[in-house]
Amino acid sequence: CDLYPERVDSAQAILVRRGFPEAASYSGEEGWKQLCERDDIDLVYIVTPWLQHVPMAVYAMEQGKHVAVEVPAATSLEECWQLVNTAEKTQRHCMMLENCVYDFFELTTLNMARQGLFGDILHVEGSYIHDLDAFWDYYQDSWRLKFNQKHRGDVYATHGLGPACQVLDIHRGDKMNYLVSMDTKSVNGLKLAEEKLGATEFANADQTLTMIK
Protein backbone atom coordinates (compact mmCIF):
# COMPACT_ATOMS: atom_id res chain seq x y z
CA CYS A 1 0.00 0.00 0.00
CA ASP A 2 1.45 3.36 -1.02
CA LEU A 3 0.18 6.79 -1.93
CA TYR A 4 1.86 6.50 -5.33
CA PRO A 5 0.78 3.65 -7.69
CA GLU A 6 4.20 3.53 -9.34
CA ARG A 7 5.80 2.57 -6.03
CA VAL A 8 3.31 -0.26 -5.63
CA ASP A 9 4.12 -1.42 -9.17
CA SER A 10 7.84 -1.36 -8.35
CA ALA A 11 7.28 -3.55 -5.28
CA GLN A 12 5.14 -5.96 -7.30
CA ALA A 13 7.90 -6.26 -9.89
CA ILE A 14 10.36 -7.33 -7.18
CA LEU A 15 8.00 -10.10 -6.07
CA VAL A 16 7.54 -11.35 -9.63
CA ARG A 17 11.29 -11.33 -10.35
CA ARG A 18 11.86 -13.48 -7.28
CA GLY A 19 9.22 -15.98 -8.23
CA PHE A 20 6.42 -14.85 -5.92
CA PRO A 21 2.84 -14.00 -6.93
CA GLU A 22 1.79 -10.37 -6.87
CA ALA A 23 0.36 -9.18 -3.56
CA ALA A 24 -2.96 -7.42 -3.09
CA SER A 25 -2.22 -3.75 -3.63
CA TYR A 26 -3.72 -0.39 -2.72
CA SER A 27 -2.76 3.16 -3.61
CA GLY A 28 -4.09 6.70 -3.66
CA GLU A 29 -5.34 8.92 -0.85
CA GLU A 30 -7.86 6.39 0.51
CA GLY A 31 -6.24 3.09 -0.42
CA TRP A 32 -5.04 2.47 3.12
CA LYS A 33 -8.62 2.47 4.38
CA GLN A 34 -9.53 -0.31 1.96
CA LEU A 35 -6.61 -2.33 3.28
CA CYS A 36 -7.74 -1.81 6.89
CA GLU A 37 -11.26 -2.93 6.01
CA ARG A 38 -10.19 -6.36 4.78
CA ASP A 39 -11.37 -9.24 6.96
CA ASP A 40 -8.43 -11.56 6.25
CA ILE A 41 -5.60 -9.64 7.94
CA ASP A 42 -4.75 -9.34 11.62
CA LEU A 43 -2.24 -6.50 11.80
CA VAL A 44 -1.59 -3.23 9.99
CA TYR A 45 1.98 -1.91 9.80
CA ILE A 46 2.12 1.89 9.48
CA VAL A 47 5.20 3.49 7.88
CA THR A 48 4.02 6.93 6.79
CA PRO A 49 4.62 10.63 7.54
CA TRP A 50 4.24 11.28 11.27
CA LEU A 51 0.97 13.21 11.18
CA GLN A 52 -0.76 10.25 9.53
CA HIS A 53 0.23 7.75 12.23
CA VAL A 54 -2.63 8.35 14.67
CA PRO A 55 -5.50 8.64 12.15
CA MET A 56 -4.38 5.45 10.44
CA ALA A 57 -3.79 3.56 13.70
CA VAL A 58 -7.17 4.57 15.11
CA TYR A 59 -8.98 3.60 11.92
CA ALA A 60 -7.19 0.24 11.74
CA MET A 61 -8.07 -0.61 15.35
CA GLU A 62 -11.67 0.41 14.75
CA GLN A 63 -11.69 -2.09 11.88
CA GLY A 64 -10.57 -4.81 14.28
CA LYS A 65 -6.88 -4.84 13.39
CA HIS A 66 -3.84 -4.81 15.64
CA VAL A 67 -1.41 -2.01 14.81
CA ALA A 68 2.37 -1.69 14.60
CA VAL A 69 3.39 1.91 13.98
CA GLU A 70 6.76 3.53 13.37
CA VAL A 71 8.17 6.29 15.58
CA PRO A 72 6.80 8.60 16.69
CA ALA A 73 3.49 6.84 17.25
CA ALA A 74 1.96 10.20 18.21
CA THR A 75 3.08 13.83 18.21
CA SER A 76 1.04 15.21 21.12
CA LEU A 77 -0.31 14.14 24.50
CA GLU A 78 -3.83 14.27 23.10
CA GLU A 79 -2.87 11.87 20.32
CA CYS A 80 -1.26 9.51 22.84
CA TRP A 81 -4.52 9.30 24.76
CA GLN A 82 -6.41 8.81 21.52
CA LEU A 83 -4.33 5.70 20.81
CA VAL A 84 -4.68 4.40 24.37
CA ASN A 85 -8.43 4.96 24.49
CA THR A 86 -9.00 3.38 21.08
CA ALA A 87 -6.88 0.34 21.94
CA GLU A 88 -8.79 -0.16 25.19
CA LYS A 89 -12.17 0.33 23.53
CA THR A 90 -11.45 -2.02 20.62
CA GLN A 91 -9.28 -4.46 22.61
CA ARG A 92 -6.62 -4.29 19.88
CA HIS A 93 -2.88 -4.09 20.44
CA CYS A 94 -1.12 -0.89 19.35
CA MET A 95 2.68 -1.11 19.46
CA MET A 96 5.22 1.55 18.57
CA LEU A 97 8.11 -0.03 16.67
CA GLU A 98 11.23 1.57 18.12
CA ASN A 99 13.81 -0.22 16.00
CA CYS A 100 16.76 0.86 18.16
CA VAL A 101 15.72 -1.36 21.08
CA TYR A 102 16.14 -4.41 18.82
CA ASP A 103 19.65 -3.69 17.52
CA PHE A 104 22.43 -6.13 18.43
CA PHE A 105 24.36 -3.66 20.60
CA GLU A 106 21.31 -2.54 22.58
CA LEU A 107 20.02 -6.07 23.16
CA THR A 108 23.49 -7.25 24.18
CA THR A 109 23.80 -4.38 26.65
CA LEU A 110 20.32 -5.06 28.06
CA ASN A 111 21.17 -8.73 28.53
CA MET A 112 24.39 -7.83 30.35
CA ALA A 113 22.53 -5.37 32.58
CA ARG A 114 19.89 -7.92 33.52
CA GLN A 115 22.59 -10.43 34.40
CA GLY A 116 24.04 -7.90 36.82
CA LEU A 117 27.34 -7.36 35.02
CA PHE A 118 27.17 -3.59 35.60
CA GLY A 119 26.06 -3.78 39.23
CA ASP A 120 23.51 -1.20 40.36
CA ILE A 121 22.88 1.13 37.43
CA LEU A 122 22.56 4.72 38.67
CA HIS A 123 22.92 6.74 35.47
CA VAL A 124 22.54 6.11 31.75
CA GLU A 125 23.01 8.23 28.65
CA GLY A 126 21.44 7.80 25.25
CA SER A 127 21.68 9.84 22.10
CA TYR A 128 20.74 10.02 18.47
CA ILE A 129 23.21 12.34 16.77
CA HIS A 130 22.24 12.42 13.13
CA ASP A 131 22.96 15.04 10.48
CA LEU A 132 19.59 15.45 8.78
CA ASP A 133 20.51 18.13 6.26
CA ALA A 134 20.30 15.67 3.37
CA PHE A 135 16.88 14.39 4.50
CA TRP A 136 14.91 17.47 5.56
CA ASP A 137 13.27 17.98 2.16
CA TYR A 138 13.69 14.42 0.86
CA TYR A 139 10.15 13.39 1.72
CA GLN A 140 6.86 14.14 0.00
CA ASP A 141 5.98 17.83 0.17
CA SER A 142 8.94 18.35 2.54
CA TRP A 143 6.72 17.13 5.41
CA ARG A 144 9.65 16.45 7.72
CA LEU A 145 11.19 19.87 7.19
CA LYS A 146 7.80 21.55 7.71
CA PHE A 147 7.17 19.62 10.93
CA ASN A 148 10.45 20.76 12.43
CA GLN A 149 9.81 24.27 11.21
CA LYS A 150 6.80 24.42 13.54
CA HIS A 151 7.77 22.08 16.42
CA ARG A 152 10.59 22.27 18.93
CA GLY A 153 12.32 19.51 20.89
CA ASP A 154 13.19 15.83 20.51
CA VAL A 155 10.51 14.82 18.03
CA TYR A 156 11.41 11.13 18.33
CA ALA A 157 13.55 10.82 21.42
CA THR A 158 12.95 7.09 21.78
CA HIS A 159 15.90 6.18 19.52
CA GLY A 160 18.18 6.97 22.45
CA LEU A 161 15.65 6.88 25.27
CA GLY A 162 14.05 3.51 24.53
CA PRO A 163 17.11 1.33 25.19
CA ALA A 164 17.98 3.45 28.25
CA CYS A 165 14.49 2.94 29.69
CA GLN A 166 14.77 -0.81 29.27
CA VAL A 167 18.05 -0.90 31.20
CA LEU A 168 16.47 1.17 34.01
CA ASP A 169 13.26 -0.91 34.10
CA ILE A 170 11.11 2.15 33.46
CA HIS A 171 7.43 1.18 33.96
CA ARG A 172 8.68 -2.16 35.28
CA GLY A 173 9.37 -0.96 38.80
CA ASP A 174 10.75 2.53 38.18
CA LYS A 175 9.48 5.67 36.49
CA MET A 176 10.48 9.11 35.25
CA ASN A 177 9.46 12.02 37.48
CA TYR A 178 10.58 15.21 35.75
CA LEU A 179 12.89 16.55 33.07
CA VAL A 180 14.84 19.62 32.05
CA SER A 181 15.42 20.18 28.34
CA MET A 182 17.84 22.60 26.69
CA ASP A 183 18.60 23.31 23.07
CA THR A 184 20.80 25.39 20.80
CA LYS A 185 19.59 27.96 18.35
CA SER A 186 18.69 26.83 14.85
CA VAL A 187 21.39 27.43 12.26
CA ASN A 188 21.31 24.57 9.75
CA GLY A 189 17.55 24.08 9.96
CA LEU A 190 16.79 27.75 9.44
CA LYS A 191 19.20 27.94 6.52
CA LEU A 192 17.58 24.98 4.78
CA ALA A 193 14.06 26.27 5.48
CA GLU A 194 15.04 29.57 3.89
CA GLU A 195 16.42 27.78 0.83
CA LYS A 196 13.62 25.24 0.35
CA LEU A 197 10.53 26.95 1.78
CA GLY A 198 11.35 30.63 1.71
CA ALA A 199 10.77 30.62 5.48
CA THR A 200 12.27 33.17 7.86
CA GLU A 201 11.62 31.18 11.07
CA PHE A 202 12.46 27.64 12.18
CA ALA A 203 11.34 26.33 15.57
CA ASN A 204 13.55 23.31 16.16
CA ALA A 205 17.14 23.55 17.28
CA ASP A 206 20.21 21.99 15.75
CA GLN A 207 20.83 20.11 19.01
CA THR A 208 18.60 19.24 21.99
CA LEU A 209 19.78 17.89 25.35
CA THR A 210 17.35 16.55 27.96
CA MET A 211 18.10 15.51 31.55
CA ILE A 212 15.53 13.21 33.16
CA LYS A 213 15.15 12.28 36.83
Language model region names:
Residues 1-18:
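N-terminal Rossmann-like dinucleotide-binding module
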Residues 12-16, 84-87, 113, 168:
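Conserved hydrophobic residues forming the short capping helix/wall of the S-adenosyl-L-methionine
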Residues 18-24, 89-93:
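A short helix-to-beta-strand connector/capping loop
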Residues 22-43:
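A structured beta-alpha segment of the ubiquitous adenosine-cofactor-binding alpha/beta core
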Residues 43, 49-50, 54-102, 116:
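Beta-strand-loop-alpha-helix segment that lines the small-molecule cofactor/substrate pocket
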Residues 47-48, 213:
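Short, well-ordered coil/turn residues at beta-beta hairpins
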Residues 90-95, 100-212:
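Predominantly a Rossmann-like dinucleotide-binding segment in NAD(P)-dependent oxidoreductases
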